[in-house]
Amino acid sequence: MFFKPDFRPRCAKWLIATGLFLMLGACVEKPTTLERVKEDGVLRVITRNSPATYFQDRNGETGFEYELVKRFADDLGVELKIETADNLDDLFDQMNKPGGPVLGAAGLIETPLRKQQARFSHSYLEVTPQVVYRNGQSRPTDPGDLVGKRIVVLKGSAHAEQLAALKAQNPGIQYEESDAVEVVDLLRMVDEGQIDLTLVDSNELAMNQVYFPNVRVAFDLGEARAQRWAVAPGEDNSLLNEINAYLDKVEKNGTLQRLKDRYYGHVDVLGYVGAYTFAQHLQERLPKYEKHFQTSAKKEQVDWRLLAAIGYQESMWQPTVTSKTGVRGLMMLTQNTAQAMGVSNRLDARQSIQGGAKYFAYIKDQLDDSIKEPDRTWLALASYNIGSGHLEDARKLAQNEGLNPDKWLDVKKMLPRLAQKKWYSKTRYGYARGGEPVHFVANIRRYYDILTWVTQPQLEGSQVADGNLHVPGVDKTQPPVPPASPVPSSSSTDESPL
């Protein structure tokens, strides 16, 4: 007879231990979304590829949404990983996939349909939906005028929801949704007459209007609406709460306003005539001087497109011009400045550009070390226009008002005061036409934006120099009256000391 050991007590103990282990495991809390982001060291964000959200230029990633979310990632101490959606429907689909992006940052509007797809943050920007049409066509004035028009909008957009609601009230309104285009494409289609109308947000129209000067606003379709970030509906509140705290913080400390100023504070300085004229001159005048701008800019370590923008603001790229105050040439140098920069003939385009580049680099180098980019560039431009003494007066006024003298957004508020006795009587250098540098900088920033856009990597090469660069919106059959420009000089030398 064999001995049969009894394993039941051991088995019971093993089962009890296993059960306790499983119970304890069940009691361990699952990490929150925010904790997972910090543990992984990566914030995955999905956005759209467009000028108002995110794109890449020769300096890398940029865009309003990108900069705002990059600062958020920096606050969290994690790396930012950007993913781009094929369209808006794809954006929400990707966010709702297991392991997908945890944040959508793409100028999103909270709508009834989207509330089922995501949860939304506090607002950071207000925009107005606008119906746009082509100049020369019949202008719609209300939703009833949309009947019988070919309308195309972005697929899955808040604009598509607006039109669906209008169509429910008026079945005669017909529209198409496209997932093969972006806002820039829609504006081009209107500009070229491929479609009658589209619907875009005011901020995106403002950023792109200059490229399509035939595009006009027909009417606003409803009130201003808030743009927000989105998180997936199935996630906990940890990340959303952190986002809201961050957006509140950048609103209070001025960071958000500075970003708005950087991307939107100068976009409306060109009207139809200005945009039309600049587009023409890009093809007709810039190619003659582009190499000079590039050579001088490289020598002085300045972006050639910024230098070209200064030249356009000063003379509209005309080398033999003279103002009533005696400044001359393509970069409109004074006699004293020209001599200091080694320019013997201000009416020689190459010399003028060299002198202007050298002078701008000198001014920029003289600014306080505490001034960082991009404010350093904007303040240097103001100094280029009004003089370093008056700029310092404006900076001191800003400091006295509790503002930041190193920030262009604050200093530009003070510059117009230099024309008011109440204020200039307290300054070292006295009266100045302080409003001029504000407009000067705004114009140059806009020209620079356009030059940056049309010389992106895919447009590089000889397209500008060869005159083959397509600038949308230029219809030379009926040009508008151009704005006033400096009076061309009849002399090709610089013999008269003005």
From Swiss-Prot:
Name under which the protein is recorded: Membrane-bound lytic murein transglycosylase F
Cited SMART domains: PBPb
Chain's role: Murein-degrading enzyme that degrades murein glycan strands and insoluble, high-molecular weight murein sacculi, with the concomitant formation of a 1,6-anhydromuramoyl product. Lytic transglycosylases (LTs) play an integral role in the metabolism of the peptidoglycan (PG) sacculus. Their lytic action creates space within the PG sacculus to allow for its expansion as well as for the insertion of various structures such as secretion systems and flagella.
Annotated region described as LT domain, given as residue ranges: 268-498
Key words, A-Z: Cell outer membrane, Cell wall biogenesis/degradation, Lyase, Membrane, Signal
Localization, UniProt: Cell outer membrane
Originating organism: Pseudomonas syringae pv. syringae (strain B728a)
A GO CC term assigned to this protein in UniProt: cell outer membrane
Gene behind this protein: mltF
One Pfam family named in its UniProt record: SLT
InterPro entries per record: Lysozyme-like_dom_sf, MltF, Solute-binding_3/MltF_N, Transglyc_AS, Transglycosylase_SLT_dom_1
Region (Non-LT domain): 30-267
Reactions catalysed: Exolytic cleavage of the (1->4)-beta-glycosidic linkage between N-acetylmuramic acid (MurNAc) and N-acetylglucosamine (GlcNAc) residues in peptidoglycan, from either the reducing or the non-reducing ends of the peptidoglycan chains, with concomitant formation of a 1,6-anhydrobond in the MurNAc residue
Catalytic site: 314
Region annotation Disordered: where it falls in the sequence: 464-498
This enzyme's EC code(s): 4.2.2.n1
